[in-house]
Design a protein with these regions (language model features):
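Residues that define the transmembrane beta-barrel architecture of outer-membrane proteins
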Residues: 25, 38, 68-77, 111-116, ...
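Outer-membrane beta-barrel pore domains
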Residues: 15, 20-21, 55, 65, ...
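Transmembrane beta-strands of outer-membrane beta-barrel proteins
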Residues: 43-49, 93-97, 133-135, 187-191, ...
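Surface-exposed coil loops of outer-membrane beta-barrel proteins
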Residues: 58-67, 101-114, 125-212, 218-230, ...
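Short loop/turn motifs that connect adjacent beta-strands in outer-membrane beta-barrel proteins
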Residues: 31-40, 55, 86-90, 127, ...
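N-terminal periplasmic/intermembrane-space "pro-region" immediately following the signal or transit peptide
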Residues: 1-47, 54-61, 179-183, 221-222, ...
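Surface-exposed loop and membrane-interface regions of Gram-negative outer-membrane beta-barrel proteins
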Residues: 8-22, 50-129, 140-145, 150, ...
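Residues on the lipid-exposed face of transmembrane beta-strands in outer-membrane beta-barrel proteins
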Residues: 29-33, 44-46, 74, 79-83, ...
Length: 405
């Protein structure tokens, strides 16, 4: 009708005259000024998981002897806010973890809301940009890949021991020789080394570096699986490392922590542990095929006990959308496999080493890419206790719905 046409024209004119436009995309709801200088994206995310028998990877004999757990878990209830201000190259991002899951005997504070990421990026030049704030240090892909962009329900057994996780600091980063066979990315940073939201307890800092070669001249995004169906073969080969002196022997989203058998940070001296760690990494994607691999070495010097320990970790995983070969195979379904290995000091006697292995098979059904998917995986987990000279094993089943709005 004439009235409807008038109403539509008036509404269109009002939208065109508005200084702010609204939309929805891969980063959630977006508000943006028409000059492009200001932008805010808001996204909500949640994971709902069922695990049997373990909620986390078993590491000690006692875990294998008590394999009776069966649990539903709300994971990573997150709010993400990011965008840019003043200029498109002045970017910001922060992320809130609204309700971390906790054990029944844990303090309620452990499940309270917390800011896990906050950072500002100055990206005027591709060859040199600066990031400052708190984020997951860009050391390796498995940890750097978002938990919402994983190929399995959770990261491998390697992650807990070798991640440097979130730190507070500053980093210089950039991309050189874009589009050539020498295409590469570099990262060099200085951090407190005490984990998330923590001041430095000494004059020492955590120093890290990463060099990534995009050997086919194309950059590979930090996300797992090839649900995007990469048309041209794309891969990267990287080496990275860090050194730190302080009370921490491991890190997580909760901050500074300790490896099994090592002093907890609350009782350790400020400069008790010197850590040197290196990683080699490979990643590749092509037409539904994805491959990712890492090899880690970690050296821990205990200045109080006068001991040196070294840890080794390795994993390789691959996935494929078989619809690309067999038309009758469902297009949204990806099948995946992973092997992981860890060698670490025995908790009771650090001069003797335990070995753990993970054999996992997984399947992903993508309703809307990584933004809405169901993941199922089955793992066979083993422990060779070097002190008692015994071998233990158990199977684990997990299923998870991961959704972002």
């Amino acid at each position: 009708s004439v009235q409807d046409a008038i109403d539509t024209a008036v509404a269109s004119a009002m939208v065109a005259d508005s200084p702010v436009k609204a939309s929805y995309g891969s980063k959630g709801f977006r508000l943006e000024t028409r000059d492009g200088n200001w932008q805010t994206n808001l996204q909500w995310r949640a994971q709902f998981r069922y695990s049997n028998p373990y909620g986390s990877d078993p590491r000690q004999i006692a875990n294998y002897e008590d394999a009776s757990g069966s649990s539903f878990e709300q994971r990573r209830l997150r709010m993400k806010i990011g965008g840019h201000g003043f200029q498109p190259w002045i970017k910001y991002y922060f992320e809130l973890d609204l309700q971390p899951a906790r054990d029944v005997d844990a303090d309620a504070v452990s499940s309270s809301a917390r800011v896990i990421d906050w950072r500002v990026d100055l990206t005027k030049w591709d060859w040199a940009s600066v990031r400052l704030g708190q984020w997951k240090v860009d050391l390796n892909r498995e940890r750097g890949d978002s938990s919402g962009r994983q190929q399995f329900v959770e990261r491998s057994i390697v992650n807990r021991i070798f991640t440097v996780d979130r730190q507070v600091g500053v980093q210089l980063r950039g991309r050189l020789f874009d589009g050539t066979l020498a295409d590469m990315r570099y990262y060099a940073g200085v951090f407190n080394g005490e984990g998330r939201g923590t001041k430095n307890s000494s004059t020492d800092h955590l120093y890290m570096g990463r060099l990534q070669w995009n050997f086919l001249g194309r950059d590979l995004a930090w996300r797992q699986t090839d649900v995007e169906y990469t048309e041209l073969p794309t891969g990267s080969l990287a080496v990275a490392g860090f050194t730190n002196t302080g009370p921490c022997t491991r890190w997580s989203s909760s901050g500074c922590g300790n490896l099994d058998g090592f002093a907890k940070p609350i009782v350790a001296e400020d400069d008790q542990f010197k850590i040197e760690q290196a990683v080699q990494e490979f990643a590749f994607k092509y037409r539904g095929l994805s491959i990712q691999q890492e090899w880690h070495r970690k050296f821990v010097s205990d200045r109080v006990a006068g001991t040196d320990s070294d840890l080794t970790g390795f994993y390789v995983q691959t996935g494929y959308f078989f619809h690309n070969l067999i038309e009758a195979f469902p297009a949204p379904l990806e099948l995946a496999a992973r092997y992981a290995y860890v060698s670490e000091p025995n908790k009771a006697m650090r001069s003797i080493y335990n070995e753990r292995e993970e054999f996992s098979l997984g399947a992903n059904w993508f309703f809307s890419g990584h933004s809405n998917k169901v993941t199922v995986d089955f793992s066979h987990l083993t422990l060779d206790d070097g002190l008692l000279e015994t071998t233990h094993s158990e199977n684990r089943f997990r299923v998870q719905w991961d959704v972002s709005f």
